[in-house]
From Swiss-Prot:
Superkingdom classification of source: Bacteria
Keyword Nucleotide-binding carried by entry: yes
Localisation per UniProt entry: Cytoplasm
Gene (name only): groEL1
Main location: cytoplasm
Catalytic activity: ATP + H2O + a folded polypeptide = ADP + phosphate + an unfolded polypeptide
Enzyme nomenclature, EC number: 5.6.1.7
Name of protein: Chaperonin GroEL 1
One GO term of the biological process aspect: protein refolding
Organism whose genome encodes this protein: Streptomyces lividans
C-alpha cells in the first residue's frame, strides 16, 4: 500500500494538533470542579472524569494528527499502568511540554539538546518529590487519599477499612451488586475457587458447606483413585486423633478412594473433605506450593520422590479453620513459618517484576495477595447502569491511588507539589544554551495541572499558580473550598508515585515528538463508487 510522508516542522505541527485535540478533551475533567465528558457508544453512555477512559475513546480523523493523539493516549495508559491514577494530569503535562518544546524548536533550538535538558529537569523534580514525600500508614491518611481520588468520603473510609484488614499487598476487588450503596466483604486467610467434590461430604447441610476446625491438610499433586495409596495415611490420621478432620487437596479424587471417604463419612468413622486443586499445569504446582508454605504441609509429588502410600503425618499441614462451599475453599490462619511465607512472597514479587505477560502478572498478583493477606470485596450498587459504571471506575481509581500512596508516600495535592518541586530548577541546573532551555520548558509546563484545576471552575489560572509558587511547600490552593492553606492538613493529598509518573511519562513522549523529523502514514484507498442503479441492463434492439 502506498505511503504518504510529512517532514520537519509540518510533521511536528501535525502531531501537536493531534496532541491538542485529545488533551483539550481530557483536561476539562481535572480537579474537584471537573466537568464530566459523556462518551456515547453502543448501549448507555459512560459518564466519567477518568483521563485514560476518555483518551482510549478518542480517534482523530486526520491520520497525522491521530499519531499525535495516539502518543498522548500512550502517556495516559502508561501512567495508569504504573500508578493507576493521575492520567488527566499526565495528559495536561504532555500537552504543555509539547507546546513549549515545539515553540523553541521553531525558534531554532536543537531538539536533541532540548531533550537532554528536559530529561535532566524531570529527574531532578522527581528526586525532589520523593524527598518531600511523607510516608503514610495512618488509617486516616489512607482514607483521605482514597476519598480525594473518588471524591467521596464514604468510599475513602471503606477503602481504608479494607486496606486495614488485608494489608498493603492484599487483594481489594470491586464487584457490581444488585443492592444500592456500598458494602465490604472480607475473607481472612487464603481462598481458592474450588469446592467440595461431593455434596455428601458437607458437614452443615443447612448452610451447604463443610466447616473443618483445626484439620489436617493433605496436599497431593496428582490424582488419587486407588484406596491402597490413601489407606496407610488415613490409618495414621485415625490413630493419631480420630476426631481431627482431614482436608484432601488433589488434582482429583475419584473411584474407590472417593467412595471410601463417603462411606466413612456416613458411618462417622472420620470426617474428611476432598477438593480439586485450583489452576492448571505449572500454575497449579505453584499454587499448591503456596498452600503448603501457608499451612506447613509438604506437597506430595513423585517429582520430588514422595509417594502417597509411603508418607506419614509429617507431610500434613494444619489451619485454625477451613470452610468449603460448593464453589470455593477458604483456609483461615495456617501456621506456616513467617520467614518461609515472606521468602515465598518475595519470590512471587520478583516474578511479577520480570514477566512481560499481563495475564501472568494478574495471576501472580492473585497468588501474592492470597499469601500476603486476605481478600476484600467492595460491592457497589447504583440506581442505573450508567451510575454504576461511573462509581465502579472511581472506586478502582481510588484503590490504585491508595496503593501508590502506601508504596511511596504522599505530597500535597491539587497540582501544588509540582509547582513547589520545580523550584529546584531555578538555576537551570547549571545547564547552558539549548539544554538550559529544555530545563525551562519543564519549569513552565509544571504549573499547567494547577492552572487547569483553577480554570475549570472559571478562575484565573496563572494568578493562582503564581500565588501558590510564593507559598511554602505543602501549602497550595484548595479548589473545592477556594482557599489557600496547608493542603496536607486539609486532606488534599496525592500519592507521590502518581505525581512522578504523571511527569515522567509525558516528558518521555514529548522528547520523542520534538526529535521527530518524518511522519509516514498509509494512503487511504479511494473507495470505488458503487455502480449506478440500472447500468448493467443493456438495450437490446
Amino acid at each position: 500500500m502506498a505511503k504518504i510522508l510529512k517532514f520537519d516542522e509540518d510533521a511536528r505541527r501535525a502531531l501537536e494538533r493531534g496532541v491538542n485535540k485529545l488533551a483539550d478533551t481530557v483536561k476539562v475533567t481535572i480537579g474537584p470542579k471537573a466537568n464530566v465528558v459523556i462518551d456515547k457508544k453502543f448501549g448507555p453512555p459512560t459518564i466519567t472524569n477518568d483521563g485514560v477512559t476518555i483518551a482510549r475513546e478518542v480517534e482523530v480523523e486526520d491520520p497525522y494528527e491521530n499519531l499525535g493523539a495516539q502518543l498522548v493516549k500512550e502517556v495516559a495508559t502508561k501512567t495508569n499502568d504504573i500508578a493507576g491514577d493521575g492520567t488527566t494530569t499526565a495528559t495536561v503535562l504532555a500537552q504543555a511540554l509539547v507546546r513549549e518544546g515545539l515553540k523553541n524548536v521553531a525558534a531554532g533550538a536543537s531538539p536533541a539538546l532540548l531533550k537532554k535538558g528536559i530529561d535532566a529537569a524531570v529527574a531532578a523534580v522527581s528526586e525532589d518529590l520523593l524527598a518531600t514525600a511523607r510516608p503514610i500508614d495512618e488509617k486516616s491518611d489512607i482514607a483521605a487519599v482514597a476519598a480525594l481520588s473518588a471524591q467521596d468520603q464514604q468510599v475513602g473510609e471503606l477503602i481504608a477499612e479494607a486496606m486495614d484488614k488485608v494489608g498493603k499487598d492484599g487483594v481489594i476487588t470491586v464487584e457490581e451488586s444488585n443492592t444500592f450503596g456500598l458494602e465490604l466483604d472480607f475473607t481472612e486467610g487464603m481462598a481458592f475457587d474450588k469446592g467440595y467434590r461431593l455434596r455428601l461430604l458437607r458437614t452443615d447441610q443447612e448452610r451447604m458447606e463443610a466447616v473443618l476446625d483445626d484439620p489436617y491438610i493433605l496436599i497431593n499433586q496428582g490424582k488419587i483413585s486407588s484406596i491402597a495409596d490413601l489407606l496407610p495415611l488415613l490409618e495414621k490420621v485415625i490413630q493419631a486423633n480420630a476426631s481431627k478432620p482431614l482436608l484432601i487437596i488433589a488434582e482429583d479424587l475419584e473411584g474407590e478412594a472417593l467412595s471410601t471417604l463417603v462411606v466413612n463419612q456416613i458411618r462417622g468413622t472420620f470426617n474428611a473433605v476432598a477438593v480439586k486443586a485450583p489452576g492448571f499445569g505449572d500454575r497449579r504446582k505453584a499454587m499448591l506450593q503456596d498452600m503448603a508454605v501457608l499451612t506447613g504441609a509438604t506437597v506430595i509429588s513423585e517429582e520430588v520422590g514422595l509417594k502417597l502410600d509411603q508418607v506419614g503425618l509429617e507431610v500434613l499441614g494444619t489451619a485454625r479453620r477451613i470452610t468449603v462451599t460448593k464453589d470455593d475453599t477458604t483456609i483461615v490462619d495456617g501456621p506456616g513459618k513467617r520467614d518461609e511465607v515472606q521468602a515465598r512472597i518475595a519470590q512471587i514479587k520478583a516474578e511479577i517484576e520480570n514477566t512481560d505477560s499481563d495475564w501472568d502478572r494478574e495471576k501472580l498478583q492473585e497468588r501474592l495477595a492470597k499469601l500476603a493477606g486476605g481478600v476484600c470485596v467492595i460491592k457497589v450498587g447504583a440506581a442505573t447502569e450508567v451510575e454504576l459504571k461511573e462509581r465502579k471506575h472511581r472506586l478502582e481509581d481510588a484503590i490504585s491511588a491508595t496503593r501508590a500512596a502506601v508504596e511511596e508516600g504522599i505530597v500535597s495535592g491539587g497540582g501544588s507539589a509540582l509547582v513547589h518541586a520545580v523550584k529546584v530548577l531555578e538555576g537551570n541546573l547549571g545547564k547552558t544554551g539549548d539544554e538550559a532551555t529544555g530545563v525551562a520548558v519543564v519549569r513552565r509546563a509544571a504549573v499547567e495541572p494547577l492552572r487547569w484545576i483553577a480554570e475549570n471552575p472559571g478562575l484565573e489560572g496563572y494568578v493562582i499558580t503564581s500565588k501558590v509558587a510564593d507559598l511554602d511547600k505543602g501549602q497550595g490552593f484548595n479548589a473545592a473550598t477556594g482557599e489557600y492553606g496547608d493542603l496536607v492538613k486539609a486532606g488534599v493529598i496525592d500519592p507521590v508515585k502518581v505525581t512522578r509518573s504523571a511527569l515522567e511519562n509525558p516528558a518521555s513522549i514529548a522528547s520523542l515528538l520534538l526529535t521527530t523529523e518524518t511522519l509516514v502514514v498509509e494512503k487511504k484507498e479511494e473507495e470505488e463508487p458503487a455502480a449506478g442503479g440500472h447500468s448493467h441492463l443493456g438495450h437490446s434492439h
